[in-house]
């Protein structure tokens, strides 16, 4: 019996609907995201529900005949006729959409979007992963008519929707807006639910496995398969295996609590700066990781003064991060599962909490920046985990994996840059609490920042 594909509600669907209604064929959209993040499922569901008919061309398995159609697009009438015959679908003017799935496999189709959009008969949606990798774009003209949308792993609210819960996150939001505590018992329950999300993650296949089996060992198998797929992709891009090594080392590098990702400690010395920049840029383009850059001058223009050679790397999905951290061990030996499932909070899990906060901020469209500066004696560094712009101010965020409320780095930073500082946040595991200028938020409320 064929397995039924579970389709999860995604927030990007509403943005796509706005595009369809507002642009009326003037642009195409490119839905970009990591492999296995749910791009194809989302766009096909959108096409099925919002159009009279659609043609989906999956370039990862298209025939030579279909691939060849895009080598000469001088006669669009002929192109549309051939597509309708090959896919046995009737296209209706301004009521049908053509989907170019895995468009990076046929760059000429992506280049053709300019002329297809100008023709105006149909809508066009592209999906792609590794879309910006040099080998996928080096010989084509990128169409300016292409609007990019990014699909990330399910965020926490989407995860709750998948579990059939539409009430919790709106209630959390109203509590956050009123800045009132929820009470210890409720906080413990909300935190336990959020820690489940940290373990399962937001990859649709992992969420499906959890819903089907209620078994984290089965979920872990699915996550291992996704990690293997990513590593295979990295080896195709970089035959030396260095990119795969950089990805595998993300948890261990974060766990060192160093002020940056130390590339040389992972792949050894003797690698040129240009090679390192290319490897990290292409890994970032794959959307399997989130990169936080050091802000050399913490203020509103952080993207202008970021240090591209000083950064931290987070896994784009915290569920994958948990599995990656113990990739060489059996599921039963992965202590992160045991510690997060129990109510015993462990200060040593700071790197897991930091990763899920990075994932949450990126899902909300934020760029990641952090800041370090030397102590008065100069023997170690103060560090602000994340910085968010807020109007003409900057908001420092410190992440704690426990109920620990001390935050020396935050205090010194706010004193040093008092004129630039807006809201100050400590994300931790206890209830919402305001003390002086600092707002203590339970980690599950990071989604509202």
Predicted regions and their residues:
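A cross-kingdom feature that marks ATP-driven nucleic-acid transaction machinery
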Residues: 2-5, 20-27, 36, 45, ...
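Interdomain hinge/linker elements that couple catalytic modules in large macromolecular machines
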Residues: 3, 164-353
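Hydrophobic anchor at the beta1->P-loop junction of P-loop NTPases
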Residues: 31
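Conserved lysine of the Walker
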Residues: 39
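Conserved catalytic segments around the Walker B and adjacent sensor/switch elements
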Residues: 48-65
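Short glycine-rich substrate-engagement loop in P-loop NTPases that contacts/grips substrate
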Residues: 61-93
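Structural recognition of the conserved hydrophobic beta-strand(s) that form the central parallel beta-sheet
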Residues: 99, 123-129, 150
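Short regulatory helix/loop adjacent to the ATP-binding pocket of P-loop NTPases
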Residues: 115, 132-148, 160-165
